[in-house]
Structure formats: C-alpha cells, structure tokens
Amino acid sequence: MVFAHRMDNDQPPVVTATLLVPLQNSSCAEAAEALLPHGLMGLHEEHSWMSNRTELQYELNPGEVATASIFFGALWLFSIFGNSLVCLVIHRSRRTQSTTNYFVVSMACADLLISVASTPFVVLQFTTGRWTLGSAMCKVVRYFQYLTPGVQIYVLLSICIDRFYTIVYPLSFKVSREKAKKMIAASWILDAAFVTPVFFFYGSNWDSHCNYFLPPSWEGTAYTVIHFLVGFVIPSILIILFYQKVIKYIWRIGTDGRTLRRTMNIVPRTKVKTVKMFLLLNLVFLFSWLPFHVAQLWHPHEQDYKKSSLVFTAVTWVSFSSSASKPTLYSIYNANFRRGMKETFCMSSMKCYRSNAYTITTSSRMAKRNYVGISEIPPVSRTITKDSIYDSFDREAREKKLAWPINSNPPNTFV
C-alpha cells in the first residue's frame, strides 16, 4: 500500500494498491513508473516538488534569525524574571495579599506557563527552520499557546467584575477570597476544556514541520471563528462595558446630566489608581493578542513556509510582549507592589519601612520579637530651686528614661 498525502491537508490521503517492485536499476524504476496510475504519479511528483520547495524556502537569512533571537530572548528573560518576582512579592509581603492580587498571581502563572512551555519552542522552530520534536510535542506547544490567552482574558474579566462591585456597589456584593479562588479555578478549567480541539487540528503528516495555523478545512474554520468569538470578542466587550460603568461612576455623572468635580468624588484615590492600572493592563493585553486571533482567521497559505513563519513569529512576539509588560505596569502604578519589592529584596520577614540604614542592636532584636523593654537610667543629680513645692516637668529626662541603650560604634547593616 502506498499513501500519498498533500502538504496542505486540504484533501484526504489517496490510498492506491500497487505492486511493490524493488527499484534496483533504471529499468525496474521505469517499470514501476509504468505501473503507477497517472493521478498518483502527479501527486508523487507534487510531493517531491513540495519537499524540494520547502527545503529552499524554509531557510531564513542569518539576520532574520539573529534579530528574532535577540528580541525573543530579551522578552523571555524579562517575562520570567518579572512574573516570578510578582509571585514572590505577593507571597512574601502582607500588604499585597488582597483579593485582587489573587487574580494577578493567576495571570503571572499563565505568563510563566507560556514562557516555559511555548515560546522557547516557537523560537527553536523559527531559528532552525524545521520542527524536530515530533507531532505530539507540536500539539502540546500549540495547546499552551491557545490556553494562556483564554485564561488571562477571563481572569481580567473577573478583575473587572471585582472592581465594578467594589466601587459601584460596595455593599450589595463582595468578591471574597473564596469566591476569587473559585473564579480563577473556573477560568482555568473551562478554558482548558475549550481549547482541547487543538490536539486534533494541529500536527502534520510531515514529521519535520509543525503547522503554524489551523487547517483551512470547514472544521478548522468553524473552530477558529468560535474560538475568536468566545475566547476574545465576547469577554472583551464585557470588559469594556464594565469599565465604562466604573469610569462613569467615578466621574459622578448625575441623572440630570451634570458632571461633578473630581475633587468631590467619594471614591478613594487608591481605588482610582487601581482602576487606571487595570484599564491600561486590559488595553495592552487586548491590543497584544488581537493580531494573533486575526492571523488565525487570515493568514498566508501554509505551503509558503517562509512567509507563514515570518507572520507567525511576528504575531507571537507581539502577543508575548504582554507577558513582559505586566510586571512593569505593576511596579509603575502600584505603590504597595513597590514597597513589597523593597521588603522582598531585604530578605527578611521584618518590613523595611525605611530606605536608609537601620542600626541592629540587642534591643532592636528584642523589639523584632515583640518584646518591649524600658531601661532605668538614674536621674542626674541637680539642685532644685525651692520656689515651689512641686517639681517641674523635665521632658528631656523622661525621654532619656525611655530611650534604648545603644552600644558605642554599633554595626550598621540593612534589615
């Protein structure tokens, strides 16, 4: 049995029963060619031509490979370091352990997942010009590439709902930590089930290639449209509507159409800054992943491997840039996160409220263990004027009595 496959997966494989003749010399080869049907010979020649064409067009210039490697390497390092720092700061610092930061940790874990399980293999495929890890690994890499944006956009929708009820309806509904954990778990589980068809669509009958896009069959096209609507368009519209209501409430637009001054707003300034940060975070995420979904709907033909690889690498780099930008936004717009980073870098459970040096003494170690001590300092003998029968209040002596004893020339270190 001889199996002839088309490279673009448009048609099912053609199966034709032929006589297997050992091609040991040219005469036997000619005899075998005579036994093959004309249609199968055409597919065989097309397959050979496509293989040669692939080897020619799949080779990339050294400049393209070097440029892509530098940009992806910088984003990869920044994403790994930044998102790991986000998880570490929220874990160590109590000031950052809020309900909203549960969602932030979930997004950081999703960014770490795509940084480890997807992006390095995409760069490897682009730089080497072929896929060398097999069809099963191709399915796994593409699965994680579809999983993480869906999880993140629904986590962002959960944050939007939390901000909406916290600011607009603070007494009617509250997103507690248990509810936040359930919302995060639902986002991961539902999206993990929703992107399982990727295992069936991706992969190729050619072992040295991993498809960049979904196949152009009607099943692949239908799933692409459904994934674009459910995994991007609908949650994006809901996010925009919720934030529109939040912004409208912050600026206090009354029923009579009169806008109040911002200084008269009852919303705390810290919550306004949080809304600004997450609004900017949503915009960066949506604009970063929009090219990826558009490329799945409209993309170069899979046979043009060089063009498809360049387009796929470009949209992957743009979408991956959102993973590296999130820690930067947290550090710029969130003062508690900056303080948490200072506490984390101090490598101590004691919080660093000051940036200057702190003198560590025996008394300060006692204070760290919540001991309170008062050193009895004998008062200085002094002559008291007998103008009154009452002693005058001496503030300096009282302060000396309550002062900590400090040794001479104590060592200066950072907590």
UniProtKB/Swiss-Prot annotation:
Traits of the deletion mutant: GPR19 deficiency induces a shift in whole-body energy metabolism by increasing energy expenditure and decreasing glucose disposal in a sex-dependent manner. Male GPR19 knockout mice show decreased whole-body glucose tolerance, combined with decreased expression of key hepatic glucose production enzymes, under obese conditions. In addition, Gpr19-deleted mice exhibit a prolonged circadian period and a delayed initiation of daily locomotor activity by causing the downregulation of several genes that normally peak during the night, including Bmal1 and Gpr176.
Transmembrane segments: 70-90, 103-123, 153-173, 183-203, 222-242, 278-298, 310-332
Protein keywords: Cell membrane, Disulfide bond, G-protein coupled receptor, Glycoprotein, Membrane, Receptor, Transducer, Transmembrane, Transmembrane helix
CDD domains xrefs: 7tmA_GPR19 (cd15008)
Gene Ontology cellular-component terms listed: cilium; neuron projection; plasma membrane
Residues of this chain annotated as glycosylated in UniProt: N25, N52
Residue ranges that the UniProt entry lists as topological domain Extracellular: 1-69, 124-152, 204-221, 299-309
Membrane topology category: Multi-pass membrane protein
UniProt keyword Transcription present: no
Tissues/organs with expression: Strongly expressed in the brain.
Positions of disulphide bridges: C138-C210
Locations listed in the record: Cell membrane
Record SUPFAM superfamilies: Family A G protein-coupled receptor-like (SSF81321)
Function according to Swiss-Prot or TrEMBL: G-protein coupled receptor that plays a role in the regulation of circadian rhythms and energy metabolism. Participates in maintaining proper circadian gene expression in the suprachiasmatic nucleus (SCN), the locus of the master circadian clock in the brain. May function as a coordinator of aging-associated metabolic dysfunction, stress response, DNA integrity management, and eventual senescence. Upon binding to adropin, modulates mitochondrial energy metabolism via the p44/42-PDK4 signaling pathway, influencing pyruvate dehydrogenase activity.
Assigned protein family: Belongs to the G-protein coupled receptor 1 family.
Protein name (database record): Probable G-protein coupled receptor 19
Organism: Mus musculus (Mouse)
